[in-house]
């Protein structure tokens, strides 16, 4: 079982989503930005390994305007060596990667121009994974698309659109249930006709709300769509509802209690779990540590390291948090449960101010005098929320910031 996250880590500011505006497109700019994106992909994968994360979704913008007609540059040849180096790192470290085209990539559309662009976009994603020379266990995830007033016809159009894909794309494509158009049963039906795997998304299933299957029943159905030898381990998406936002919004962090309840129901299937959550790799580390603690393989240093990482965030909500921690056993899951409850509580004004000042002390040697004066001005004016927003901007300028700062800015 691997646990991972999507696209943009929090604990490093390496990123792969640099873009080019159409009006600014040139070969030199394209080569420069693509090189930066690929260099940072390598850094992110190396960083993930250090944090025991072996599942990662690569963002679609890794190759700027990768499927746009303006881009006639043979990026596969230009970056052949770099792409193969990244692919070798992925294979040597048994990392599993995936990609997920955006909502406008729909192969069941009735519009020919949209279908053409959608197929071209899927082929771009496939070409990227192929250029890494990774096997077909590294997938491209796609939603079915729109209903367009006739669900039966929309399903048939998906089957027709699928047939227009290259053989490589067909082998990489997996389909996911969504929250409003195509339910788990719909996706399983399409899967049975195309013989391709299904990605089960728990929150989408809850939002769609058309079945009362237990998780074990769902997993028993979904796992049959995966050929382990060809497609790899069954992969699922796990997320939780943000209680303060509209239905279907992902939570700021994974509640460890909810995750472990989920895990207890599905552990016999040993799936790879992609977390869809705002704090990305931080929640991945949280879930990985918790399962290691359950399986008695957790490094003894992990408890102290995580408290150190979270200390500013804890202080923001409780100036006396240290006294409470002293009453705990050295149990990381107990700590995470305390943390999850604390993050739902109002900020402690005294603790919030103190946490900002401590964060500033960690950061002060890396920022300009002007930035320092402005931050102090916000603190003196008791504009603590604005001070944290400003602090977040400053931290994001650092490629590998101290972890306690990354954890601190991961939550508002």
Swiss-Prot record:
Single GO molecular-function term? endonuclease activity
| UniProt keyword Ion transport present | no
One Pfam family it belongs to: UvdE
**Which Enzyme Commission numbers does its entry carry?**
3.-.-.-
**What's a single GO BP term from this record?**
nucleotide-excision repair
Q: Which Gene3D superfamilies match?
A: Divalent-metal-dependent TIM barrel enzymes
Family recorded in the similarity comment: Belongs to the uve1/UvsE family.
What HAMAP family does UniProt report for this protein, alphabetically? UV_endonuclease
- Under which name does UniProt file this protein? UV DNA damage endonuclease
Provide the gene name from the record. Answer: uvsE
